[in-house]
């Protein structure tokens, strides 16, 4: 049985007097695919901002890999990332330069960075683009770098 990597329970958020989302419940299993769909103003961005800890919920709980995001945000955020449709990349960098930069600003120990970069590139299918400038990759491969 696969673990729940993200679990949302009774999630609600209120902007002053209006509820943006109310009593949202869902779970995403490890290696799962999940679509958050809805019309404009349905609360998709609010929900994602709460899951990414950009916004604090009014009610309910978010668990990342079993860790309560509200109670232990630093530990929980180690297990999640968010990639917007248009990734904010430094396109003048090579893939390796960018991945090193990202690991460095996340304060990963320098001796662990090269191995982590290789794992990430292999997992995303971009190993053969290591020395290529990001601007010279297709949109799909740029998303993988992000």
Give the residues covered by each predicted segment.
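ABC transporter nucleotide-binding domains
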Residues: 3-6, 13-146
């Amino acid at each position: 049985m696969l673990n729940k990597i993200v679990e949302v329970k009774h999630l609600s958020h209120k902007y002053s007097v209006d509820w943006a989302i109310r009593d949202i419940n869902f779970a995403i299993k490890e290696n799962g695919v999940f679509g958050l769909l809805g019309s404009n103003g349905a609360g998709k961005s609010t929900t994602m901002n709460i899951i990414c800890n950009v916004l604090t919920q009014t009610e309910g709980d978010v668990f990342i890999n079993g860790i309560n995001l509200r109670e232990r945000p630093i530990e929980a955020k180690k297990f999640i990332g968010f990639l917007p449709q248009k990734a904010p990349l430094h396109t003048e960098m090579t893939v390796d330069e960018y991945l090193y930069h990202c690991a460095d600003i996340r304060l990963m120990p320098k001796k662990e960075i090269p191995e982590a970069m290789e794992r990430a590139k292999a997992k995303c299918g971009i190993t053969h683009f290591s020395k290529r400038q990001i601007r010279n990759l297709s949109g799909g491969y740029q998303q993988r770098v992000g």
